[in-house]
Regions:
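Core catalytic lobe of class I
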Residues: 1-178
Length: 178
């Protein structure tokens, strides 16, 4: 296993093609932003898509034949991300993450969600361990068969079932200092 936390442009040429089983990328959103001494300026949608292509195609080459990729984006750049991802990978799903952070807006809705695109190199051969990501949920309608719980368990802390995860995430929060 290997985690690389580096500037993409500094390390990409040193990574062999087909190396990664999983890539998680959180590129600059198409906003005017100053972050840790670096400035990113918003651009036209076409220019932003070309910016994404300038490194995304190379990332796809680094993905293993059965590899997966997750790409994060806000609502303004999400459609550009989708178009660029579809040029090289198969999109399996779009996860909507409801986040607690977000700035209020006096003349608009507060932006408190982000998209996380889940894409793979080969839609017929990729790894997804659904058992590892099942959710423990409180049972609201405790069905029984022959007096025994059907698809749920009764514990000291209540009635729960393990259920398949959805593409709406509202149970993950990021500390305010991040």
């Amino acid at each position: 296993d290997c985690i690389i936390n580096a500037d993409l442009y500094d390390c990409l040429d040193f990574i062999p093609d087909g190396w990664f089983n999983l890539i998680v990328v959180d590129p600059p959103y198409n906003l005017d932003k100053y972050f840790h001494g670096h400035r990113f300026s918003s651009m036209t949608e076409n220019d932003y898509e070309n910016y994404l292509r300038s490194w995304f195609y190379k990332i796809c080459d680094k993905l293993a034949p059965n590899g997966s990729l997750y790409m994060c984006g806000d609502w303004k750049c999400s459609s550009s991300m989708q178009r660029v991802i579809e040029e090289r990978l198969a999109i399996i799903n779009r996860i909507t993450w409801q986040r607690e952070k977000g700035r209020g807006a006096k003349s608009n809705w507060k932006n408190a969600m982000e998209d996380i695109w889940f894409a793979v190199k080969n839609p017929n051969d990729y790894y997804f361990d659904v058992e590892a990501v099942k959710m423990k949920r409180k049972v609201r309608a405790p069905y029984r068969v022959d007096g025994k719980p059907k698809d749920w368990a009764e514990t000291d802390s209540g009635k729960f079932r393990l259920t398949y995860p959805s593409n709406f995430w509202d149970d993950i929060s990021i500390p305010f200092w991040s």
